[in-house]
Amino acid sequence: MIRIINLRVAVTVKSDIKSIVEKKYPPLRGAIETIHVVRRAVDARKKPNIVFVYTLFIEVHNEAQVMKKLGKEKDVSVFAAEDPEPIVLGAKPLAHRPVVMGFGPAGMLAAFYLAREGYRPIVLERGQDVDTRSHDVETFWKKGIFKPESNVQFGEGGAGTFSDGKLTTRITHPRLHEISKYFVEFGAPEEILYKHKPHVGTDKLRTMVKAMRERIIEWGGEVRFGSKVTDLFIENDRIVGVEVNGSERIDTTVVLSGVGHSARDTYEMLYKRNVEMTAKPFAIGVRIEHDQAVIDESQYGVEPSSLGLGAAEYSLVYHDKESGRTAYSFCMCPGGQVVASASEEGGVVVNGMSLYARDSGVANSAIVVNVGPDDFGTHPLDGVAFQREWERKAYELGGSNFHAPAQTVGQFLGLSQAPSVQNSIYSYEPGVVNCDLHDCLPSFVTSVLERALPYWGRRIRGFDDPAVCMTGVETRTSAPLRMGRNEERISPTVGGFYPMGEGAGYAGGIMSAALDGAETAILCMAKYAKPN
């Protein structure tokens, strides 16, 4: 196989990729069997001359002869694709079916691989199926009626179901492409296999997770909604069963825990049951919203649809010399909306979401500042208490009815005659209240944001416009703790318990969580034979 990198093609060029390759590299004419687009990125650094930058895998006739004719082309090489390691099944007897806690990306992929290999997992998800859950979430947004077990955080697909559906990850692993191909099989757009910053969108994600659940069941797995694991049964420091909804017992010696970073009551239960965990850093801040046209103009210099481009994205970082902290944009959602994401009564949490089309006309992103155990304490659950404190203050500022506190950039920076939120763009439902965001965030966070906003305004024109709306608070950027696990991914303190995914502190997004779930299941299967 031949690999071509850095193939630069103007976005205005309409020729097919095969013709472009053959024109640039004449020895390939007539020799190409297949072309696979591995990656396509947008380079808009020299506006208005915007280009796609491709990486390609190409299968050809007479590869050695073609490479000889190509000579020393620096961007062309012979490439041997690395396949995922084959799955090897273990021999240790498994008297009961394995249990998977949670049906987000980690739990879903763990269950998928277990079911594919005949292990018939039992999935216990505290929330509801995606259709019921979507109705409950819409009711919460429109009417403020909150359901603590069916919301943006809990239910089929996990928190990622109500997000932009980003599939980006910094991890390189041969199984990632395999997982992406499964996602396409179940309804994700084929472009996720090659786009530099792939996304699915919350609308397509809902279809995809349902199809994956149906396949797990078809292969002998069981998926139970409204089923919260409320306790672990442990004998001689090993799992022997789980309690469901405070009453039912399911015997098992293997539990793969894919609970999310918002399952705080589950964290507390696991801590009481001696599952090893430590506090870890995360970040908190607010959501900021702009007219998408402002971001498009800054990033592309033109209206993106005229060039066949999607709504523009951004990624911003500010290193604060005064405090030593870092502020950064997080989970940027082009053409999306800010959503109410509470998972508990008495707290306001915001997040961002986009449909696949990203066509709302409004860009939003979290802008957050790093915090750590030095700020909130070293007890494993201190980060949870810290999050709750600021979520509660935001809830009270908003009127104790899940309306969110919001403030314009001008007000936040203390500018005279700054416009109010009522005259700005905001999308949070059930509503916002113009408040001082300094009252629902620690001063060491707000002071960094005050310095970061003008800095970012010099990089994206209009970013710090006084009329831009910010909504609080964003606290669930990542898990506030990490559960211990050994080289087999088993808890060192509770045998048979496998922490995995974002809630356990081992992932930071859909793809990394999915991969962690898959690889954890594969290691589990390498130890155990199929259950009777």
List each model region and its residues.
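Residues forming the flavin
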Residues: M1-F52, L56-F162, K166-N532
